[in-house]
Amino acid sequence: PQPPAAIIANTPNNPTGAVYSRESMAALADVATDADALLVADEVYDHFDFSGRFESALTLDRDNVVVTTSFSKSLGITGFRVGYAVFPEDLVGSALTRHTLVNVAISRPAQAAVLAALRETPPSYHESVRDTVRGRIDDFTAALDDIGAEYTEPEGAFYVLARFEGFPGSVENVQRLIDDAGVAAMPGAAFGEASEEWIRFTLCTDRVDEAADRLAAYFGDR
């Protein structure tokens, strides 16, 4: 087998909501160094940290660490697909070449919109959004408790992984939730074998309480 070219770590994590400590990221950077590989830290959910422990991998100051992030999540503009990456200086030229070949460029209106948002958005906006998402997580997991479901307690991002007895996270079961309960989710199987029993719910809608009620009714009748 070929040696790895990169280790990718998403923190805060989708789908688990885990926030990796600075020490864990440093350990991953060491593993990458031993393999002559890059550590790519995907920090797209950096503004959705409920733990207070998130630190950017940029603080490691390593020459084999790349950090990527996106305004699509932090500013709530997912359709714009605007983000950036921070590369070691000796890799910037190669990164630009590959980006040009794959993406060419993002749209100018999207860039202008993000620039305006960066200039005008106060820190209180991110605090308010975090509080809103945290409240949705609390309400949703309370409903999961009521129906006896197992779930992860997210430290960041806006997802909850849940497991329902006798209802694994397959594509077929997620389709059943859509058809019979009117709740859309992602099959855990999409995230690998370790998540096959789980279903991922995204809590970025103001109808979280309604979704929780529908799940309670659906699994209460099973």
What are the residue ranges of the model-derived segments?
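Helix C-cap/helix->beta junction micro-motif
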Residues: 34-35, 147, 181
